[in-house]
Swiss-Prot record:
Annotated signal peptide: none
Catalyzed reactions: Hydrolysis of DNA containing ring-opened 7-methylguanine residues, releasing 2,6-diamino-4-hydroxy-5-(N-methyl)formamidopyrimidine; 2'-deoxyribonucleotide-(2'-deoxyribose 5'-phosphate)-2'-deoxyribonucleotide-DNA = a 3'-end 2'-deoxyribonucleotide-(2,3-dehydro-2,3-deoxyribose 5'-phosphate)-DNA + a 5'-end 5'-phospho-2'-deoxyribonucleoside-DNA + H(+)
Catalytic activity, EC: 3.2.2.23, 4.2.99.18
GO biological process entries: base-excision repair
Subunit structure: Monomer.
Comment on bound cofactor: Binds 1 zinc ion per subunit.
Protein name listed in UniProt: Formamidopyrimidine-DNA glycosylase
Organism of origin: Prochlorococcus marinus (strain MIT 9211)
Length: 286
C-alpha cells in the first residue's frame, strides 16, 4: 500500500497538474470506487462544473478543495474530494484522451479534453465527495481517528512515550497503528527502526528515552529521504507522469532478505511481526 511518501508524491503531482482544472465531465467505471453516499450518480452530479483548488494530504488520504469557477479567487468552498489509494490505486495524466485501460475506475476531463485518470488494479481504492457544510473527518472514520503527522510539532518523543507507556505489543505493530502516527506503513516502519537501532519485536512500552528520540528522528529523516526520491515502487505505485519511485534502491533493510547489511555486512533477516513481513539486521538492531 502506498505510504506517506508515495501519497505525498502523488499530492505534489496533482497540485501541479490540476491547478484550476475545471471538471467538465466525470465518468465512473467502477461503482465500488465511490464510497460517499448516493454512489456514482450523486458523485458525478456534485463534482461536474467545479474546479480543483488546493491538494493536501492527511496520513494516506489525498484531499482536494473544490469551488465554483466564479469563486476561485476568494476560494469559497463548494465541497471536498477525498481519495484513498489503498493497495494499488494511482493517477495518470493524459494531455489527449485515449481509450482507458482495463483497470481504469474513474475519469475526469477538463474543457480542453485533457484527462486525469484513476487506475486501480485490485479495485480497493475509494473516493468521497464531501459537501461544503461537512468536514472530511465528520464523514470518513479513518480520517477522524488518525494520529498526528510525523512532520508536525505534535509528534515528538514525549508524545510517543505517552502513547506507548505500558504497551506490550511490538514497536513495529505500534508504528503501523494509524491512530498513533498517520501515514507510516510496513516499508518505513522497518527502515526507521533499523536507522534507530531498535529491534522490531521489542515491546513498545520498553523503549527508553534515548530510543524514543532516535526513533522520532529516524522516522522524519527516512520519510523525507523517500519523498525526495519520489517514494518506493515495488509493484504498482507510480507518480502522475508514470515514473516509479526510486527509494527502494537505497533501502536499508526492506525487501533485502539475506542480503548483507549496508552498515555491518550481517545478512538481513525476514520474519513476521503483527502478521506483516518484517526486515531487520540482527546485529545493528540487537
Amino acid at each position: 500500500m502506498p505510504e506517506l511518501p508515495e501519497v505525498e508524491t502523488v499530492r505534489k503531482g496533482l497540485e501541479k497538474r490540476l491547478k484550476n482544472f475545471y471538471i467538465d465531465n466525470v465518468e465512473v467505471l467502477s461503482e465500488r470506487s465511490i464510497a460517499s453516499n448516493g454512489g456514482s450518480n450523486v458523485f458525478i452530479f456534485n463534482l461536474k462544473d467545479l474546479v480543483f483548488g488546493r491538494w493536501s494530504r492527511r496520513g494516506k488520504y489525498l484531499i482536494a478543495s473544490l469551488c465554483k469557477e466564479s469563486d476561485l479567487i476568494e476560494e469559497i468552498p463548494s465541497g471536498t474530494l477525498v481519495v484513498h489509494l489503498r493497495m494499488t490505486g494511482y493517477f495518470e495524466w493524459h494531455q489527449n484522451t485515449k481509450a482507458p485501460c482495463t483497470h481504469t475506475r474513474v475519469r475526469f476531463w477538463n474543457k480542453k479534453g485533457s484527462e486525469i485518470r484513476f487506475i486501480d488494479i485490485r479495485n480497493f481504492g475509494q473516493m468521497w465527495w464531501i459537501p461544503p457544510n461537512k468536514l472530511p473527518s465528520e464523514v470518513i472514520n479513518g480520517l477522524k481517528n488518525l494520529g498526528p503527522e510525523p512532520f508536525s510539532k505534535d509528534f515528538n518523543p514525549e508524545y510517543l512515550k505517552y502513547c506507548l507507556k505500558g504497551r506490550k505489543r511490538s514497536i513495529k505493530s505500534s508504528l503501523l497503528d494509524q491512530s498513533i502516527l498517520a501515514g507510516v506503513g510496513n516499508i518505513y516502519a522497518d527502515e526507521s527502526l533499523f536507522e534507530a537501532g531498535i529491534t522490531p519485536i521489542k515491546a513498545s512500552g520498553d523503549l527508553n528515552g534515548c530510543e524514543l528520540k532516535k526513533l522520532c528522528k529516524s522516522l522524519t529523516r527516512i520519510l523525507k529521504a523517500s519523498i525526495g526520491k519520489g517514494g518506493t515502487t515495488f509493484s504498482d505505485f507510480r507518480d502522475l507522469e508514470g515514473l516509479n519511485g526510486t527509494y527502494g534502491g537505497y533501502a536499508w533493510v526492506y525487501r533485502r532478505n539475506q542480503k548483507p547489511c549496508r552498515k555491518c555486512g550481517t545478512l538481513i533477516e525476514k520474519t513476521k511481526v503483527a502478521g506483516r513481513s518484517t526486515h531487520w539486521c540482527p546485529n545493528c538492531q540487537n
